[in-house]
C-alpha cells in the first residue's frame, strides 16, 4: 500500500516471512544506494517504488502481522496496464508548470490567422534539439511544446491544460531507474536558476523506444512522482515576469545547462529562496549562502590573471619588509613575530570577501546599471556609495562568526549582489554580455 509516499509492506502470515521482511528492512548500506521494489496497483498497473538502503523503517499499525512502512523518495507508475515491463528508460520528459513560464507555450499558436478557429504553428518553429556532452555522457536536450489536445466525454476541451511546454532528455542507450534522479537534478538545477526559487513544479514522464513500420520513436510509458516536489506552492503565484526565459538565452542554453550541472564548475544557488513568498524577506542563512556563491564565482571566474599578479607583488613586498625587519636592532623574538605576521598575510596573499565583491561589481557594473535603472524598486548607487554598502554587508556577514547576525543596512545591496552573481554565471557559460543583460533585465521584474 502507498499513501503520500509512505509505503506499507505486509508479509505472508508465517513467522519465517515476517522475520525475512524485518531483516531486509534492517539492512543498512552506508553508500545509501537506491533499491527498487516492483508491484501491481489495484487497477492492474505496474509500479516501481524506490527505497533508500540507508533509510529507516517503522512498524505498521498491525505489529502482530509483521507489517513495516518506510518513506519512498521516488515512485514510478505505468500509464496503463497495456504497456510491457521495463527495467529502465530511454528518455525523460519534464512538462508544464514552471517550464511553461521559462518557455511560454503560446508560441504554438498562430495569431496571424483569421479568428475562425485555433491554428497551430509548425512544430519546427518551437522545437530545438541540442546535443549535450556532460559528465562523460552524451544525450539530446529538446525544448518543445505539446500542442495536442485531449477530449474527455461530457467535458469541454481545456486548451490551457493541454498545451504545455516541455524539456526532454533523449538517450540512445537504456538507463536504469536509479539514473532518473540524476536527470531530474539536471533539469531542476536549470529551472531553479531560471525561476530564482528552489521549489519548482512540473510533471515528469519516463520514455521508452517503440517503432511503427520500422520508424523508431520515443513514447511515454510511466509517470514519476518525487517526494518533496511542489504541487501548487510556486506556479500559482510565480509569473512570467519573475523568471528568465529560454528564448532570451537562445543557443546559450547548452553551455549554461552544462555549467549548472558540472561537478567542478557549478555555481552555488543555495541563496535562492524556496518559494515566491520567501522572496519578501532575507534570511541570515541566505546572506551566508550568497557569500559562499561569491567565493565560487571569484574562484572560477575571470579573476585569476589579476590575482596572480597581486600574489607576485605581495611576495616581493613581503621579502622587502622582512629584510627591513632583519636590519633593525631589537630582540630576536620580536623580529620572529613580525616576520611571521608579514609572511602569513603577504606571502600567502588572498583577497578578502570585500575585495571579491568589489571585483565582481567593477566587472559587471555596466550590466547592473542597466537592470537597476529599469526598475523603480531597485536603488542605484555611485561607486563610492556601493563600496560603503559592501563594507556594511561584509561586516554583517562576519558578525555571524561571533554572535547572531547584526542587520546594519548592508542588506540593501543583497539583490544587487545576486544580479552580479547571475552576470558572472552567464559569463562563465560563455554567454555574451548583451544576452545576459537582456535575460536578467526581463527576468528580474518582480524581485521582492
Residue ranges of model-derived segments:
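Short N-terminal signal/transit or membrane-insertion segments
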Residues: 69-76, 80-86, 221-232, 322-337
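Short, charged N-terminal helix-start/capping segments
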Residues: 5-21, 29-32, 97, 101-106, ...
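Amphipathic, oligomerization/interface secondary-structure segments
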Residues: 231-448
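Long, contiguous, compositionally biased segments that the model treats as domain-scale units
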Residues: 1-198
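A sequence-composition feature that detects small, non-aromatic residues
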Residues: 16, 25, 50, 67, ...
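Serine/threonine-rich low-complexity intrinsically disordered regions
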Residues: 14, 29, 41, 64, ...
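Residue-identity detector for glycine
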Residues: 39, 55-62, 66, 84, ...
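Internal, Lys/Arg-enriched amphipathic helical interaction segments that engage polyanionic partners
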Residues: 178-255
